[in-house]
Amino acid sequence: MFMGEYQHAIDPKGRLFMPARLRESLGEAFVATKGLDGCLFVYPKEEWKRLEEKLKALPFTRADARAFQRFFFSGAGECEVDKQGRILVPAHLREHAALEKDVVIIGAGARVEIWSRERWSKYNEKAAPSYEEVAEKLIDFDL
């Protein structure tokens, strides 16, 4: 399970330090893709395989299922950690998440998310007021 929030900077070549605590569970190679809300989703290979199977099972006759599969899989790529603990974030993913300098890496349960600091701040400002309301709605899931 991934948790925590880490502040880092991405360099002009797209290299980003991945915190050791997260690397331990991600492994040496993992999958990054376009995430929702303007961030990147990062999955360990085992979790990616489970998700891939679920998404492949969606009915291809539904336009929304096809659209989501295209978006999700077309942005995906394998990332590896270098000797300095950095990953190279591909240009198309940096563009999707507006990663230019200051970056926030968060643990989000089964995945890691990578955000531009600006987007993360805006997301938190927007989401924080509804946190308790959402928690009340999720009570039905026996949390």
From Swiss-Prot:
GO molecular function ontology, one term from the record: transcription cis-regulatory region binding
Keyword Iron: no
Any one of the GO CC terms: nucleoid
InterPro entries associated with the record: MraZ, MraZ_C, MraZ_dom, MraZ_N, MraZ_sf, SpoVT-AbrB_dom, SpoVT-AbrB_sf
KW DNA-binding (keyword) present: yes
Gene3D superfamilies found in the cross-reference section: Transcriptional regulator MraZ domain
Residue span, SpoVT-AbrB domain: 5-47, 76-119
Cellular compartments annotated: Cytoplasm, Nucleoid
Assigned keywords, A-Z: Cytoplasm, DNA-binding, Repeat, Transcription, Transcription regulation
HAMAP family per the UniProt record, alphabetical: MraZ
Family statement: Belongs to the MraZ family.
Protein name, entry field: Transcriptional regulator MraZ
Gene source species: Heliobacterium modesticaldum (strain ATCC 51547 / Ice1)
